[in-house]
A protein has these predicted regions:
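Structural alpha/beta core scaffold segments of enzyme domains
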Residues: 1-187
Length: 187
């Protein structure tokens, strides 16, 4: 912002605190404000948000809307899935692309899909940009898989645990992910 070489700038941080993601990209706006104020006044500047403002101004976990169709046999074994996810990214991309990609990569969770199509839309909105958050899209994708399993069990009046076991990845077959990676490690 000021065109200064990196070695001429000193930034002191009392402590970073817990959390994940928001400190990766979303601290830049506050650093810019502090830098401009320091350049204007010639004095060191401290910028500390109170918790309410911090919660309003910084990104959160991407919320997802998902729709899916599944085909399965009478025992609850999945034959194919078609999953469409949409996430609220906020007013800028931030880390939305990799978060959404990871949600798609985790939409199988621990289950084999013989036929699969997974799509994801990144929705730009007039809200604060969502960002990296623990799980980084994984929980959103895995939740879709669990919704599918629960729906099959409910529809067929089966024990959800039995439906889960029936659809787990296999050791010698049924072990290829939707993105063509062979599952080799089993517990």
């Amino acid at each position: 912002v000021l065109g200064l070489p990196d070695h001429t700038v000193t930034v002191e941080v009392r402590r970073m605190g817990g959390g994940f993601g928001g400190k990766e990209t979303q601290a830049a706006q506050w650093a810019v404000l502090a830098a401009l104020a320091a350049a204007k006044t010639g004095q060191p500047v401290k910028c500390r948000l109170d918790r309410d403002l911090d919660m309003i101004m910084t990104g959160k976990r991407h919320d997802f809307h998902s729709e899916w169709e599944v085909s399965y046999d009478q025992d609850g074994r999945i034959a194919g899935v078609d999953i469409h996810m949409a996430s609220r990214c906020g007013c800028s991309h931030d880390l939305s692309d990799p978060v959404n990609d990871r949600a798609m990569f985790h939409a199988d969770n621990a289950y084999f899909y013989p036929a699969v199509r997974i799509r994801s839309d990144r929705c730009q909105t007039n809200t604060v940009s969502n960002t990296a958050f623990r799980g980084f899209g994984g929980p959103q994708g895995m939740l879709v898989a669990e919704q599918i399993i629960q729906a099959i069990a409910h529809e067929r009046r089966l024990d959800p645990l039995d439906v889960r076991r029936l659809n787990f990845y296999g050791q010698n077959d049924r072990n290829l992910t939707p993105y063509h990676m062979q599952v080799e490690d089993f517990v």
